[in-house]
Amino acid sequence: KNNAQKYNAKTIVFFTEPHAAEYFSKVRDKNQIPPPRICPWREKFQLLKKSKIDFACFLKFNSKLRTMSPDDFISQILDSINLVSFTVGDDFRFGAGRKGDTDLLKNWGEKKGILVENTETITLDGQRVSSTRIREELLNNNFNNAEKLLGRPYTFSGKIVHGQHLGRTINIPTANIWLPNQRLPIKGVYAVKCKLNDLSLNGIANMGVRPTVGGEKPVLEVHLFEFNENIYSQRIRVKFVEKIRDEKKFDNLDMLKSQ
């Protein structure tokens, strides 16, 4: 953004979609589970909008992009945009085999009159800030540490969809939230704070497969305290406050209710 102001230019951020690890898990080894996303693309878009980024460009990660050489990536993608500066992460790699690096970009930039910069490694408490580290903090219920690494509280927002309606049979209705990639970087039962339109609501959430009812696919469901309205198809934002316990399998729904 500083360079955009300096050159009186617009800002654009590039992403690949899906994540490379998700792509390779489907085409190479379907048994290899990719790491869960910390921030889905819709969430990224909203954060960029809040940061007043002008444009977001999502590059489809497919066989064509995967096999594209670094030189072709530059000529077919970067050269198609009227760039005046280009900033990448400290460990940025691109092109087939991850052969493209910052040095190649800087050589290209010098020829084109484009400023190419790489960000310095960001550390906290002497350790590099990375997605792996953030996932570990979230999984270990260290939400304060995760917030420091993210620069914001960890939240997830999604559309409320129909489930099996089993919660209503024990007078504990839940809002089932659609998961775009089946998993979140957390699992278990959590105390949560939710934002639904203009309402701020407290509740309890379960992120897991629901073993008591024979579930297999991961599901995020939230029970909102003192709230029982039809909110299907609406979007809800969930802030995870504290982990209460791991997910457990109970003999029946009545035993689950007593918990």
Label each region the model flagged.
Residues P18-D90, F94-K112:
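N-terminal Rossmann-like or analogous alpha/beta NTP/dinucleotide-binding catalytic cores
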Residues E43, N145-R152, M255-Q259:
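A non-catalytic, amphipathic alpha-helix used as a structural packing/dimerization or gating element
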Residues A4, H162-Q259:
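Phosphate/ribose-recognition catalytic cores of enzymes acting on nucleotide-derived substrates
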Residues L48, F86, A146, V192, ...:
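Residue-level signal for inorganic ion chemistry
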Residues G109-G208:
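Glycine-rich, Lys/Arg-enriched anion-binding loops that position phosphate/diphosphate groups
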Residues K1-F14:
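Histidine-anchored nucleotide/phosphate-binding helix
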